[in-house]
């Protein structure tokens, strides 16, 4: 019988990789808590109409990439392709906007899009996102960008660039849309097939085409910054000034429009040159009309989402290592020693140590070889003689230094050992 494998476009995250995910999630949680953001969790599937109204029926996501199905009640449901629409739906449904003030929220979880799988692009992928709802202040745009910058810097990532643009308000976009269509129409036959389809349906997305000839044509296309009204221009100027005040470098990119219809004013991406076609690690912008489009009160908002698979791929590409190693590797052999080793391991864990207990039952020699491979700085050796005397052998694996001490003394010295373990790790880095 043939084995069953993971579906195309999905992948298992194995223990040697999960340490990256845990580090990213822990770092993000710490940064977001310090900025007074609260976590929200929404369902993985929603009514299809939510995404059709929120993202836009003319987008590639809604038109080509959503996983949509009918349930047994003949209701059309869709696995979420992104997180913002669900967050807004939740706030409207639970009347959280009635509380007034500014809502600062963050989320993380799996998203689903039917795309051609490749490195950094899966059909099930994970996003970490933030949303600030209730503030039209340009400082809110700068704040969410600053938080993303903090996360990338805290993770020790380099070689990324913040790309910035404004897509204006609805009136600005309409003027620019017409100017872009007027410019591109004479070149229609030279555009790639996807761009030809988008010309009258969603022309701004043509600016994001990866086709070489289409990119050449777009080089001389009108720039949206020249079509901004005074209000939009002032907003964008203040965002840029705030980023300058914060010391966050950026580049203006007039072709940056993002792929979702709900964006207004500020649009931004954190891009890298190290992941080939999957250059965007984090993307976001302002979406002042989305809440009203989904039936809520007039509420300005801004946010971003990070693709965690791409972020972790970048960490690995830059050889940034996060290793999960035990503090102690506990070796035991003997009828008296083995049950006692389990008790000792639990006591050490209760003292806050990471303890790996060898459960193989193999000879001491084989267990000690596994201890060497574990990466633990300390090995505890417990035979029947030590167990009967309530002692244990403590061995520093790097130096071979070894001593015998009572199990009580071992626990009493926990603070000292914790400091020595920390020192041993710092010496390696």
Curated annotation (Swiss-Prot):
GO terms for biological process: histidyl-tRNA aminoacylation. It is found in: Cytoplasm. It is an enzyme of class 6 (ligase). It catalyses: tRNA(His) + L-histidine + ATP = L-histidyl-tRNA(His) + AMP + diphosphate + H(+). The keyword ATP-binding applies. InterPro entries: aa-tRNA-synth_II (IPR006195), aa-tRNA-synth_II/BPL/LPL (IPR045864), Anticodon-bd (IPR004154), Anticodon-bd_dom_sf (IPR036621), His-tRNA-ligase (IPR015807), HisRS-like_core (IPR041715), HisRS/HisZ (IPR004516), HisRS_anticodon (IPR033656). This is Histidine--tRNA ligase. It comes from Cyanothece sp. (strain PCC 7425 / ATCC 29141). The lineage of its organism: Bacteria, Bacillati, Cyanobacteriota, Cyanophyceae, Gomontiellales.
């Amino acid at each position: 019988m043939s084995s069953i494998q993971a579906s195309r476009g999905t992948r298992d995250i194995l223990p040697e990789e999960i340490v990256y995910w845990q580090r990213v999630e822990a770092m993000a949680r710490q940064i977001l808590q310090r900025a007074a953001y609260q976590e929200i969790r929404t369902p993985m599937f929603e009514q299809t109409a939510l995404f059709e109204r929120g993202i836009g029926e003319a987008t590639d996501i809604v038109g080509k990439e959503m996983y949509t199905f009918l349930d047994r009640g003949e209701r059309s449901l869709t696995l979420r392709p992104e997180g913002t629409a669900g967050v807004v739906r939740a706030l409207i449904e639970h009347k959280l906007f009635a509380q007034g003030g500014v809502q600062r929220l963050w989320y993380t979880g799996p998203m689903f899009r039917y795309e051609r799988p490749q490195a950094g692009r899966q059909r099930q992928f994970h996003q970490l996102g933030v949303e600030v709802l209730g503030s039209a202040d340009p400082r809110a745009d700068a704040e969410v960008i600053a938080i993303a910058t903090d996360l990338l810097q805290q993770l020790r990532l380099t070689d990324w660039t913040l790309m910035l643009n404004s897509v204006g308000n609805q009136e600005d976009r309409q003027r620019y849309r017409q100017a872009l269509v007027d410019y591109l129409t004479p070149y229609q036959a030279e555009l790639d097939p996807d761009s030809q389809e988008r010309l009258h349906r969603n022309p701004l997305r043509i600016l994001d085409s990866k086709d070489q000839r289409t990119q050449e044509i777009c080089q001389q296309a009108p720039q949206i910054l020249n079509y901004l009204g005074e209000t939009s221009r002032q907003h964008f100027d203040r965002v840029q000034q705030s980023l300058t005040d914060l010391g966050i470098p950026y580049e203006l990119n007039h072709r940056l429009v993002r792929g979702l219809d709900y964006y207004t004013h500020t649009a931004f991406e954190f891009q890298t040159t190290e992941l080939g076609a999957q250059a965007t690690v984090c993307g976001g912008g302002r979406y002042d009309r989305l809440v009203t489009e989904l039936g809520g009160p007039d509420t300005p908002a801004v946010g971003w989402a990070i693709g965690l698979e791409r972020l972790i791929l970048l960490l690995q590409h830059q050889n940034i290592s996060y290793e999960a190693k035990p503090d102690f590797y506990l070796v035991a052999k003997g009828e008296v020693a083995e049950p006692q080793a389990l008790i000792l391991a639990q006591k050490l864990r209760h003292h806050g140590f990471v303890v790996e207990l060898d459960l193989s039952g193999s000879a001491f020699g084989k267990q000690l070889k596994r201890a060497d491979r574990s990466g633990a700085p300390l090995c505890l050796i417990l035979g029947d003689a030590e167990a009967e005397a309530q002692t244990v052998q403590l061995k520093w694996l790097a130096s071979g230094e070894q001593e015998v001490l009572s199990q009580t003394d071992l626990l009493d010295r926990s603070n000292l050992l914790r400091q020595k373990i920390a020192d041993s790790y710092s010496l390696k880095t």
